[in-house]
A protein has these predicted regions:
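Conserved SAM/SAH-binding loop
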Residues: 103
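Conserved phosphate- and dinucleotide-binding cores of soluble alpha/beta proteins
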Residues: 2-5, 9-12, 18-24, 30, ...
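HTH-adjacent hinge/linker in prokaryotic transcriptional regulators
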Residues: 2-30, 34-99, 107-115, 119, ...
Length: 252
């Protein structure tokens, strides 16, 4: 493959996934790490990607990739994370399930459970869980985002704040190198904070593509959650925050 073709293919992968690691690209294109690093540096110089240590992300921090693209990426990783999270939730538990494709995978993994009571602002989660007659599904009111089935706004925030539940299943768009949790929508950030504040145990579910991914709204530190479920060891800066704050780390 010519360099220009490889550059175009790298851009497509970054657009599709939001973030790609150097290791992924080496395996994908069967070239040396040095070659990939040169490619990424060239693309960063052209402002076509944002260079991170160990990978690359989209240069924009204001627009998320589409729900359909996110749904189709990292599916095996999301399923492993979802199964691990589901194994930690007992029958009869109460829980929030957040917006995002990984929380949606968790919802699917919970279908073998019994007598769960779920509050969600994710229409896709409600549609998945409604097939269970013994589940009680409480869907938050608010403004429906047609692009991904998320429900947000002041009404959503007020609704979620009424509850105090056992678990909060939280997704996130990106995690900066200092452990900051990043999102694209300010209204969604406020809802996530409400889920954190009203959950006894918060489980952050993230695949490796979220590490180093850029987004414009800072929700706060990863230290806000009780446990992180992911498929790879987080970058050194994130790991330091996890260790310093005794956050549980589960590699799936």
């Amino acid at each position: 493959m010519k360099q220009t073709q490889r550059h175009d293919a790298i851009i497509e992968l970054v657009k599709k996934q939001g973030y790609v690691s150097t290791e992924e690209l080496v395996e994908q294109f069967a070239v040396s790490p040095q070659t990939i690093r040169r490619d990424l540096n060239d693309l960063a110089d052209q402002n076509r990607i944002l260079r991170h240590h160990g990978g690359a992300a989209l240069p924009s921090s204001s627009v998320n990739t589409s729900w359909h693209d996110r749904k189709a990426t990292q599916t095996a990783e999301k399923e492993r994370i979802a199964r691990k999270v589901a194994s930690q939730i007992p029958n009869g538990a109460t829980l929030f399930i957040d917006i995002g494709t990984t929380p949606e995978a968790v919802a699917h993994a919970l279908l073998d459970h019994e007598n769960l009571r779920v509050v969600t602002n994710n229409l896709n989660v409600a549609n998945t869980l409604m097939q269970k007659d013994d589940f009680r599904i409480i869907l938050a009111g608010g403004e429906l985002r047609s692009r991904d089935g998320g429900i947000i706004g002041e009404a959503t925030l007020d609704f979620i704040s009424q509850f105090r539940l056992d678990f909060g299943i939280l997704g996130i768009s990106g995690i900066d190198t200092d452990g900051s949790l990043l999102e694209f929508d300010y209204h969604e950030v406020r809802t996530k904070r409400a889920i954190i504040e009203n959950s006894r145990h918060v489980m952050l579910v993230v695949d490796h593509s979220k590490f180093g991914r850029n987004a414009m709204v800072n929700m706060g530190s990863i230290s806000l959650v009780n446990a992180v479920y992911t498929d790879v060891m987080p970058p050194a800066g994130v790991m330091q925050v996890i260790k310093d704050n005794n956050v549980q780390l589960e590699l799936c």
